[in-house]
Amino acid sequence: AKPYGINVLHDSEGQLDVFVTDSEYVIDKDPVEVHGRRIRHWKLTVEGDAISHTLVNTFGDITGPGMLYEVESIFADRQHNRLMIADEQENVIKVYTMDGDFTGIILAKGRFAGDPEGIALYKCGENDGVWIFTDQSHDRNRFHLFDRKSLQYLETFTMSQTTNTDGIWLTQKPTGRFSDGVFCTLNNDKNVSVVNVSSFKEAMPHLFRCDG
């Protein structure tokens, strides 16, 4: 087992839902049952300085198109009850429910030139927004955009001087000089590229301006 991706989000009762992927590289030597434990879901409770945790679920299909192989990044969308799971061996994003059921939806099949890596979600209100999926490359990354609600492909953008990206993160909260939030990408395991979300709104207003 090799813990890799993690996503943490608050629930309605003030606890934390934590989803962790198991990216085991020795795929051919795994018994089939191991694929059923590719994702772990914990509940964390924080009380003062104390943290308690409970394992809620372990899951992953063991047969069929929803079977999870080399899983890396993971990201939850509670409003739509979806988990986006990057499967590097199959070069796709597989969509599960937060309860651990495969939805039958596979995104970006045939679209990744490199490896599917970091995932981020740009929200427009409770239901709308844009998914960002990293297409890792040693030359130049590509970032594929999908509609949050319909899961339809929208378009792809690149970032100059940013390569070999694994993790990404996006916040829409104003932070200092980043008035609309910030988009961060790991750059070739050396540093972090930082982009003002305002740049997205200027370059792709039809996607990132929530007011239309």
Spell out what each predicted region is:
Residues 1-212:
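Sequence/structural signature of beta-propeller domains
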